[in-house]
């Protein structure tokens, strides 16, 4: 794992934000952000998710949306985020990485662009007009 700088903004009020170093974690589906930091910028939960943690425990946590900006990519996108406990690491998960169209390169410790797969098998199947 390696870290990247991320700006986290409130989608409804982009002037409310903070910058933080996030661990790139391809094993985490969602990005994890300590809930007090999300609350500070006015992000509110939209629902909950059942999570399987790395140590095998299960937990139910709040889920919200935040605008994530990764300066090295020069792009901002709204991504789902988990309201994590106060002592949690900041994690940039697989959903955000896919949204940005990047993969983690552990050799260079950088995010690298990837081609998006659209529809997989169905998109490549021959089409019949009727």
Task: Set out the residue ranges of the language-model regions.
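Pepsin/retropepsin-fold aspartyl endopeptidases
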Residues: 1-130
